[in-house]
Regions:
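Short, well-structured N-terminal submotif of metal-dependent ribonuclease cores
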Residues: 1-51, 63-74
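Histidine- and aromatic-rich ligand-binding microenvironments
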Residues: 19-20, 51-53, 104-105, 126, ...
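A generic structural signal for short hydrophobic patches within well-formed alpha-helices
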Residues: 24-25, 56, 92, 129-130
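Amphipathic alpha-helical segments within well-ordered protein domains
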Residues: 57-60, 96
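Short glycine/serine- and small hydrophobic-enriched flexible loop segments
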Residues: 61-64, 116
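Short, hinge-like loop/turn segments at secondary-structure boundaries
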Residues: 66-70, 102, 138-140
Length: 140
């Protein structure tokens, strides 16, 4: 084992985050919480951030509708720097179980299942996810 691997083991796994649609939308729509999300969005990359494909859909749609195509494409460009996680049948089954267990909607269940699958902390202001242990809730 090389020195880097030993150091990595002592420190434990690197913290992975998942920025919920709420955070991306706040940031790119210049919402009231944009500054709170800025450190996460601006440092997001494939090494430290996972993004469910359904989040790409939600963010692109809402930003395009509110701010236009150029701003929506900027949001997509930033999200595409992260590790985009496709919805597989296994992830869909896990999301369905989460939906049943916590009475969450489809998108929130997919986000939570993705976070669990990648051992990621969810960064959000979504009230539906606030009670989940892996959530860092940014208050309004």
């Amino acid at each position: 084992m090389c020195g880097h691997e030993q150091t990595q083991k002592r420190r434990g796994p690197l913290l992975t985050i998942l920025i919920d649609s709420y955070g991306w939308i706040e940031y790119f729509a210049d919402g009231p919480l944009a500054e709170s999300y800025a450190p996460y969005v601006e440092k997001a990359d494939a090494e430290n951030t996972v993004t469910p494909a359904v989040v790409v859909y939600e963010v692109y749609k809402k930003i395009k509708n509110a701010k236009g195509e150029q701003k929506a494409l900027e949001a997509y460009a930033q999200m595409s720097r992260t590790k985009i996680v496709e919805l597989t049948s296994i992830l869909a089954l896990k999301a369905a179980d989460i939906s049943i267990a916590f009475s969450l909607g489809m998108v929130d269940s997919i986000i939570l299942a993705t976070a669990k699958e990648h051992n990621a902390q969810i960064i959000t202001s979504d009230q539906h996810l606030k009670s989940q242990k892996q959530v860092k809730h940014i208050s309004k």
